[in-house]
Amino acid sequence: MTHNVMCDDVLPQLNLPDGVTRWNANLLEEERRLRNSDGHADRIILTINTLGKRSKEAQSLNTILTSVPRLRENRDARLYLLCHGGRGVGILKIGVKRLFVVPPSHAGLMEIEPVCVLDFFVDTSNQRQGYGKILFEHMLAFERLSPGDVAIDRPSVKFLAFLRKHYGLVEYTPQSNNFVVFHKYFERHQQQRRGVGGSGRSGYQHCNETTTQQLGTQSGLLEDINQTHPAPSYALRGVVMGHTGPPLDLTNVTQQQKPYHQPFATGRKTSYELQYERYLQSQNCRPTGNAGYGGGNGPASSAEVRATNCQARRRTSPTRSGVPYNIINGSTGS
């Protein structure tokens, strides 16, 4: 199958209310054990696997990042599934990763354990209707996170544009592991270390520090997933746990969106802004059709743009997910 052809598996009808449900391996196994007399749990599993395949093809990845077998391999991972009209619309997979990154304040490595967005996909027939924002914000609400608290595994330029438009997230330091950690993350947790405030949801420490204490926990992902959590401090509709919950009114969802606006400093453009301009130019030059998906015309990730600019210094490195990320050699040669 070529990248220009999306997975043609038909998404089954689900007995789930419109809105977001949250799943992990344990909940899926419980659903299959207790509520599968009519094949309902099997249809949920088929939906997750199908959307995972479509995500892989849409992003031109070498491997499927989201599937029920992968959730069984990483039992701390959580999957947010958005449904509308009784069918799956989008998926968002998260998990905690231990990362070694260079913060913006100094050149030394720092160890952090943030919640990471590992896969984020809205079915192509439902894009540009506000579903991605619904899915992302419901994840933030349940994980008690702000947008700048999450790290993102190899985000596309489209995802970076989404974060800038809705949350004003722009500045980040390119990392060799191709995770994007915005400067807001470090600013927030520097304040937390000084006791000024913060969510306490993501921990970090410098590699040369002797203390083993880290801020917060692993974002609650090691907690019992069925544990009762306090309600969010703001109104939230349609977020459900497993198979129960109120319906979500998705009528006129695009009209309900109000993008987050943040003033940006004028003057020299950031590296992200230059990447974003390249992405917009590629969209203008793209032939009509399924823009942004498949073949060599797809938008490059921030790491790919940076690696391409380095030409001879470019190399690939396998990762835990099997995706060959572009990273930069320290030497000037190949």
UniProtKB/Swiss-Prot annotation:
EC number(s) given by UniProt: 2.3.1.108
Organism superkingdom: Eukaryota
Residues the record lists as binding acetyl-CoA: 120-133, 156-165
Keyword Acyltransferase annotated: yes
This protein's record includes keyword Acyltransferase: yes
Sequence segments annotated as region (Disordered): 314-334
GO biological process, one term: microtubule cytoskeleton organization
InterPro entries found in the cross-reference section: Acyl_CoA_acyltransferase (IPR016181), Atat (IPR038746), GNAT_ATAT (IPR007965)
Entry keywords, A to Z: Acyltransferase, Transferase
N-acetyltransferase domain segment(s): 1-186
Crucial for catalytic activity, annotated site positions: Q59
Catalytic activity: L-lysyl-[alpha-tubulin] + acetyl-CoA = N(6)-acetyl-L-lysyl-[alpha-tubulin] + CoA + H(+)
Family according to the record: Belongs to the acetyltransferase ATAT1 family.
Function field: Specifically acetylates 'Lys-40' in alpha-tubulin on the lumenal side of microtubules. Promotes microtubule destabilization and accelerates microtubule dynamics; this activity may be independent of acetylation activity. Acetylates alpha-tubulin with a slow enzymatic rate, due to a catalytic site that is not optimized for acetyl transfer. Enters the microtubule through each end and diffuses quickly throughout the lumen of microtubules.
The protein's name in its UniProt record: Alpha-tubulin N-acetyltransferase
